């Protein structure tokens, strides 16, 4: 339901050119989970790095360094080529994904503290206190950083950690926000998509999602795609601020906690019904589904003609764009985050605290 209408000049090109870095948990500010990287046809495990507790979030990669937050309270910086530790910093329990912007890395913890660190050394530059747990990754608008928190608030801070604005909703915020063309898009536990002006934090409009959302919305062209806890995937027309189509998994009525990966043709999203679903991006019709052995809270990533997605069944699956399995990799624990892709490598963490790097040996 349209609550307020404002015409938005939103033009996110279909053929976005992605940087080699994977500096945000879905690869880009629009949260589409697509990489233009070239990965080897055959992937081998190049190295493993052990932390002392689970990794629930997605690792990020910048300038050949992997940044991983662990529930052992440390943020780790790991060399992408060798898997050797560059530095680690004791913070708080980390279940959120970090984000890199320029020479800084950012992450929030379970106590509601948000930290900005020097990317090269791990030195803490500043911290900001919220009133609720932080499980979402940050996103950025230039030097400004956007932080969703469980205290029902989205915060916008400047590079010095000073609050520019905040926006409150009627429920906790679990997922990251998308950023596109002067606006940020927030789907939260108030069953509403909020469209906000990036500079002021003022509402530009909202859409009733018919269910709570715990994932990041993805913006592609004039449309936004998001899953809900009510067993739905929605496409929202951003100029009209209305639902264009909606999909419900037909049998087991389970929530979509994962974020969607979106390319020109497909919306690919994992569900707690143990399946990965691929929908026609324009119509929402089912193209195919792929059954894993457990729930799929991890978000898929599209790399060329392949889809990479992890499951609670402790496997990383490689599918083609028709949903046919090309390969699978058995890891040491459940996969809750997205793969990160950079430098010809794919990096992913498990709830046993292991970071895996796959590539050409």
Language-model regions: role of each:
Residues 1-2:
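N-terminal secretory signal peptides that target proteins for export/translocation
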Residues 20-46:
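Blade/loop signatures of beta-propeller domains
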Residues 79-82, 118-122, 158-162, 197-201, ...:
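Short loop/turn segments that connect beta-strands within beta-propeller blades
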Residues 15-19:
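Sec/Tat signal peptide C-region and signal peptidase I cleavage site
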Residues 5-13:
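Sec-dependent N-terminal signal peptides
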Residues 26-29, 47-60, 70-74, 85-101, ...:
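Extracytoplasmic beta-rich repeat domains
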């Amino acid at each position: 339901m349209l609550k307020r209408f404002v015409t938005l000049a939103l033009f996110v090109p279909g053929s976005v050119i992605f940087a080699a870095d994977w500096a945000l948990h879905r690869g880009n500010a629009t949260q589409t989970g697509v990489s233009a990287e070239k990965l080897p046809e055959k992937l081998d495990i190049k190295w493993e790095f052990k932390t002392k507790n689970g990794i629930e979030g997605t690792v990020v990669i910048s300038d050949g360094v992997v940044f991983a937050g662990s529930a052992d309270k440390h943020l780790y910086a790991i060399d992408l080529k060798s898997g050797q530790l560059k530095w680690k910093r004791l913070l708080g329990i980390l279940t959120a994904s970090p984000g890199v912007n320029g020479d800084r890395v950012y992450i929030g913890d379970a106590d509601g503290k948000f930290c900005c660190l020097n990317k090269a050394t791990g030195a803490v530059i500043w911290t900001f206190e919220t009133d609720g747990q932080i499980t979402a990754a940050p996103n950025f608008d230039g030097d400004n950083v956007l932080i969703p928190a469980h205290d029902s608030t989205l915060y916008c801070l400047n590079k010095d950690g000073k609050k520019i604005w905040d926006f409150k909703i009627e429920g906790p915020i679990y997922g990251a926000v998308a950023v596109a063309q002067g606006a940020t898009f927030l789907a939260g536990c108030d069953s509403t998509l909020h469209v906000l002006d990036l500079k002021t934090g003022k509402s530009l409009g909202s859409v009733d999602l018919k269910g709570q959302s715990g994932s990041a919305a993805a913006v592609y062209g004039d449309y936004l795609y998001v899953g809900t806890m009510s067993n739905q995937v929605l496409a929202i027309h951003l100029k009209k601020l209305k639902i264009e189509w909606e999909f419900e998994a037909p049998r087991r009525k389970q929530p979509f906690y994962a974020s969607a990966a979106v390319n020109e043709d497909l919306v690919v999203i994992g569900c707690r019904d143990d399946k990965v679903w691929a929908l026609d991006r324009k119509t929402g019709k089912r193209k195919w589904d792929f059954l894993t052995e457990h729930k799929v809270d991890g978000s898929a990533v599209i790399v060329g003609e392949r889809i990479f997605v992890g499951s609670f069944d402790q496997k990383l699956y490689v599918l083609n764009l028709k949903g046919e399995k090309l390969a699978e990799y058995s890891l040491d624990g459940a996969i809750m985050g997205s793969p990160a892709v950079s430098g010809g490598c794919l990096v992913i963490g498990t709830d046993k605290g292991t970071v895996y790097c796959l590539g050409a040996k």
